[in-house]
From Swiss-Prot:
Molecular function terms, GO-annotated: GTP binding; GTPase activity; magnesium ion binding
Biased composition (Basic and acidic residues): 464-504, 512-526
Residue numbers spanned by region Disordered: 63-82, 456-534
Matching HAMAP family: GTPase_Obg (MF_01454)
UniProt lineage: Bacteria, Bacillati, Actinomycetota, Actinomycetes, Micrococcales
Name listed for the protein in its UniProt record: GTPase Obg
Gene giving rise to this polypeptide: obg
Gene Ontology CC entries for this record: cytoplasm
Domain of life assignment: Bacteria
């Protein structure tokens, strides 16, 4: 099972926003308490954060799907929904975030550096937030919006000061084990090193990190061997050390030919220039400071080979060190030479100041277009597609099972100028209009304008729409007032009729008189029965 993973494809999705609530305040002696529906909670974000406790992307290799929690639903009594919890994903220092197409989204360097990989969805407004002077008691609420979902690629580029490069079995792992406390796997066969190894070296007062990457072979820049896959771990290094094998067992190899092949592969390798760092430049690998370490001089033929090629290498301008990872010969001089390169690189980094761009406040343009209309054709019929962040978001927030919510959407689109734009594009009543790109969130409808050119609104009061007349008529406020007045008039007429009957003597007998009359009649009936019996 793999223990080191430096590239994964991660599927992240933010939490969905909670729906707004439709509720009316109910309290004793307050039959019309007004709307009190709360807003839905926002969905949680997915954030990548650099942590020194994380050294590999192995966890995301086994579990590549990560989803933040959703926002809670709004409730009555003005209670808002719970906010979705933010999902923090720890990543190693030096992680590069890319799209599947290779576009760099972020380069995460430094403890605590963050990047929002997927934002959570916005919670919907409750009917209390939608009320106004004209809309006192909305019978609808806005729906929550789904969170962002995307597939991102995480690539780990190890952060080291010095990189050891060379052919397989050149002794790179032995060197890093001899110079630091790192304990990489060491064996006497090629490609023993399958993952990058990091070690910390101290030379006097200078402390720096060296990286051991898998061996390079001819054609590594084209994907041969393992070197091309791990060369990105060398991109952040300030200097390189060529580790040359002076005791190779292959007859067609020697330190000079090995160096030429490695230099050619480094020159062919294209450094990722999409992130240029603070100074705005990325130095190619073959132009960075280099040292040459002639390794394995403790062998019988190694010392002779090192003395034979040393003059040639120094003539080319290289600083050459004869070292042995087994006997530790020459390692002290090599470590101090590395420290000099690291110190010089750090001094240059401190001299170069970051270009601080002062914040510029740009007010929103007054006449900025919030949408675009694209005429299309489908099945030889005209089609008009409305695109824009606002219209698409409004469609996602609309509950299409509620006629009043659809009317509210129509009002918003009309105020935004969508209807005027359709007129200008030549749209006619009955033409097909699509809001958004084709997909699950797109809305298709036959356009029936609520406003003709220069005419008044043809639609009724708030919440009504001519396109939904077949669904049933909803009484307007004026109709409700008329019905209420008719009921009051009917009650007044009934009272007047009762009053006229009372004045006519129909209702003059009181309750006590009726009781006395009934008691008298019952006594007379009883005496009549007694006389008949005698």
């Amino acid at each position: 099972m793999a223990s080191f993973v430096d590239r994964v494809v991660l599927h992240v999705s933010g939490g969905s926003g909670g729906h707004g609530c439709v509720s009316v305040k109910r309290e004793k002696f307050k039959p019309l308490g007004g709307p009190d529906g709360g807003n839905g909670g926002d969905g949680g974000n997915v954030i990548l954060r650099v942590s020194h406790q994380t050294t590999t992307l192995l966890d995301y290799h086994h579990a590549p799907h990560r989803h933040a929690s959703n926002g809670g639903q709004g409730m009555g009594d003005w209670r808002g929904g719970k906010q979705g919890e933010t999902l923090i994903l720890p990543v190693p220092d030096g992680t590069v975030v890319k799209t599947k197409d290779g576009e760099v989204l972020a380069d995460l360097v430094g403890e605590g550096t963050e990047y929002v990989a997927a934002a959570g969805g916005q919670g919907g407004l409750g009917n209390s937030s939608l009320s106004s002077q004209k809309r006192r008691a909305p019978g609808f609420a806005l729906l929550g919006v789904d969170g962002e979902a995307s597939d991102i690629v995480l690539e780990l580029k190890s952060i080291a000061d010095i990189a050891l490069v060379g052919f397989p079995s050149a002794g790179k792992s032995s060197l890093i084990a001899a110079m630091s406390a790192a304990r990489p796997k060491i064996a006497d066969y090629p490609f023993t090193t399958l993952i990058p190894n990091l070690g910390v070296v101290e030379a006097g007062e200078v402390r720096f990190t060296i990286a051991d990457v898998p061996g390079l072979i001819e054609g590594a820049s084209e994907g041969k061997g393992l070197g091309h896959h791990f060369l990105r771990h060398v991109e952040r290094c300030t200097a390189l050390v060529h580790v040359l094998d002076t005791a190779t067992l292959e007859s067609d190899r020697d330190p000079l030919s090995d160096l030429a092949i490695i230099e050619a592969e480094l020159e062919k390798y294209a450094v990722d220039m999409s992130y240029a760092g603070v100074d705005g430049e990325v130095i190619p690998l073959n132009e960075r400071p280099k040292l040459v370490a002639l390794n394995k001089i403790d062998t019988p033929d190694g010392k002779d080979m090192a003395e034979f090629v040393r003059a040639e290498l120094e003539g080319r301008g290289y600083r050459v060190f004869e070292v042995s990872a087994s006997s530790h010969e020459g390692l002290r001089q090599l470590s101090f030479a590395m420290a000099e390169l690291v110190t010089a690189a750090r001094a240059r980094a401190t001299v170069v100041t970051a270009k601080i761009t002062p914040p510029v406040l740009r007010p929103r343009a007054v006449n900025r277009k919030e949408f675009t209309i694209r005429p299309e054709e489908r099945n030889l019929e005209p089609l008009f597609r409305v695109l824009g962040a606002k219209p698409v978001r409004w469609v996602k927030q609309t509950d299409f099972t509620n006629e009043e919510a659809i009317g509210y959407l129509a009002e918003r689109l009309n105020k935004l100028g969508v209807e005027d734009g359709l007129f200008k594009k030549g749209a006619k009543p009955g033409d097909t209009v699509v809001i958004g790109e084709d997909g699950e969130n797109a809305v298709v409808f036959d356009w029936e304008p609520t406003m003709m050119a220069g005419a008044e609104l043809l639609s009724g009061p708030r919440g009504t729409d001519p396109r939904f007349t077949d669904l049933g008529d909803r009484p307007t406020r004026s109709q409700k007032r008329e019905e209420y007045q008719e009921r009051r008039d009917a009650k007044s007429a009934a009272r007047a009729e009762l009053e006229s009957e009372r004045k006519a003597g129909i209702w003059t007998e009181s309750v006590s008189a009726r009781r006395d009359r009934e008691a008298h009649e019952s006594r007379e009936a009883a005496s009549t029965d007694d006389g008949d019996a005698l």
